[in-house]
């Protein structure tokens, strides 16, 4: 199966500037393709997982993935589908975030000097040195303001009479210039992104084609939500991060273990590397035993992101907690100062401090709603004082919020 055929088969395809021509070229030769990532956090989350799997698929087919970190464009902010302007990041924040993003990506793709090895570039390398007058003279005439105003990302802001700064308006020009620069210096012929980036991608392809005459393409993926309409990557407890310093492998496993029944076959197709035969068996399993299918999905995706050992550990921890009622040290751990526990802390404050409630009032609601347990015993008094007498073996206290969120408090 070719790259494009597998791309479509896995459910990644939404739109392409010239699908037939791109299919032919990717069969005949190896290309370089790029995807850009925002520099807004020290890790990517599962909202970017489809794009990451596409980079991985590119590499598996012998094509060269180029990862662009928007160090330059992050200083401006992309207005795409945003109701408000983004916070502008400092150079120090961008550098720190870029390091974390490369860590996320390195779990899935190989960086290096080989022909199909991925490279990571920061568009600040070429955007920071742009002379504004030279840019207007050399490239300004290729952009149509009439066309830019019709793009949904701009049009919606204007229709709602929301502020759209000239700073943000320039983002489209700079992203288009990225494609031209990568085509010229890295022989990049394909830009990939979410469907919300279609207008920006087409502008870049058009600019490159007009100036260089090269065959370049843009291709987008559908914007994913869960079956209930929730945005991928976000939960009530926060983002589902890929880096283990922000989210433990166990919590990553639990996210997929607890996904909605209607999503698991689609997620297996999008995010796992099960063969077609294995996917067929998985679909049959999901129809017969949804919980076993969810365990398999969680295991496969945790193995891909964190390692087979991490997946095994997460599975064993889940079994001990949910099926055997034991305490497992692989649960997420929160450290509490010994003096705090010696003095005593109220139950609702402990749940808030441990991160199982976003506020003290939320912690009170959790306890009043019979959703809080300490050492597997229901907490009925939100003001109950928790002290060192609650410590179990190995100096831990087990906290549970609902049936699926568990952590250990260690002193």
From Swiss-Prot:
GO biological process, one term: tyrosyl-tRNA aminoacylation
Subcellular locations according to the entry: Cytoplasm
Gene3D superfamilies in alphabetical order: HUPs, RNA-binding S4 domain, Tyrosyl-Transfer RNA Synthetase
Function: Catalyzes the attachment of tyrosine to tRNA(Tyr) in a two-step reaction: tyrosine is first activated by ATP to form Tyr-AMP and then transferred to the acceptor end of tRNA(Tyr).
EC annotation from Swiss-Prot or TrEMBL: 6.1.1.1
Main location class: cytoplasm
Keyword Nucleotide-binding included in the entry's annotation: yes
Catalytic activity: tRNA(Tyr) + L-tyrosine + ATP = L-tyrosyl-tRNA(Tyr) + AMP + diphosphate + H(+)
Biological source species: Rickettsia felis (strain ATCC VR-1525 / URRWXCal2) (Rickettsia azadi)
Broad EC category: ligase
Pfam families: S4 (PF01479), tRNA-synt_1b (PF00579)
Binding site for ATP: 234
InterPro entries: aa-tRNA-synth_Ic, Rossmann-like_a/b/a_fold, S4_RNA-bd, S4_RNA-bd_sf, Tyr-tRNA-ligase, Tyr-tRNA-ligase_bac-type, Tyr-tRNA-ligase_bac_1
Protein name per UniProt: Tyrosine--tRNA ligase
Binding-site positions, L-tyrosine: 34, 171, 175
Name of encoding gene: tyrS
């Amino acid at each position: 199966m070719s790259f494009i055929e597998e791309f479509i088969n896995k459910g990644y395809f939404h739109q392409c500037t010239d699908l037939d021509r791109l299919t032919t070229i990717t069969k005949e030769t190896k290309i370089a393709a790029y995807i850009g990532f925002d520099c807004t956090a020290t890790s990517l989350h599962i909202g970017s997982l489809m794009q990451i799997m596409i980079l991985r698929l590119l590499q598996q087919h012998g094509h060269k993935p180029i990862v662009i970190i928007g160090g330059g464009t992050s200083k401006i902010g992309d207005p795409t589908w945003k109701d408000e302007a983004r916070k502008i990041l400092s150079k120090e924040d961008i550098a720190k975030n870029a390091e974390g993003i490369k860590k996320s990506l390195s779990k899935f793709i190989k960086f290096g000097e080989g022909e199909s090895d991925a490279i990571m570039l920061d568009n600040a390398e070429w955007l920071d040195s742009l002379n504004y007058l030279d840019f207007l003279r050399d490239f300004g005439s290729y952009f149509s303001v009439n066309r830019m105003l019709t793009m949904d990302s701009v049009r919606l802001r204007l229709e709602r009479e929301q502020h759209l700064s000239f700073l943000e308006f320039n983002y489209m020009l700079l992203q288009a210039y990225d494609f031209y620069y990568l085509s010229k210096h890295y022989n990049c012929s394909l830009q990939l992104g979410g469907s919300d980036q279609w207008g920006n991608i087409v502008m870049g392809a058009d600019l490159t084609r007009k100036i260089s005459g090269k065959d370049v393409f843009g291709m987008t993926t559908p914007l994913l939500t869960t079956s209930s309409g929730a945005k991928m990557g976000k939960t009530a407890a926060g983002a589902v991060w890929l880096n283990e310093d922000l989210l433990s492998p166990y919590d990553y496993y639990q996210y997929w273990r607890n996904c909605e029944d209607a999503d698991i076959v689609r997620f297996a197709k999008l995010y796992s590397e099960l063969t077609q035969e294995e996917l067929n068996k998985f679909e049959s399993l999901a129809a017969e035993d949804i919980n076993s299918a969810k365990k398999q999905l969680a295991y496969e995706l945790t193995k891909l992101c964190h390692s087979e050992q991490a997946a095994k550990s997460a599975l064993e921890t889940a079994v001990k907690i949910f099926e055997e009622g034991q305490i497992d040290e692989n649960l997420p751990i929160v450290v509490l100062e010994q003096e705090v526990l010696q003095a005593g802390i109220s139950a609702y404050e402990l749940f808030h401090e441990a991160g199982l409630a976003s506020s003290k009032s939320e912690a009170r609601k959790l306890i009043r709603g019979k959703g809080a347990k300490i050492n597997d015993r229901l907490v009925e008094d939100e003001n109950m004082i928790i002290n060192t007498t609650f410590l179990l073996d190995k100096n831990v206290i087990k906290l549970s919020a609902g049936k699926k969120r568990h952590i250990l408090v260690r002193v």
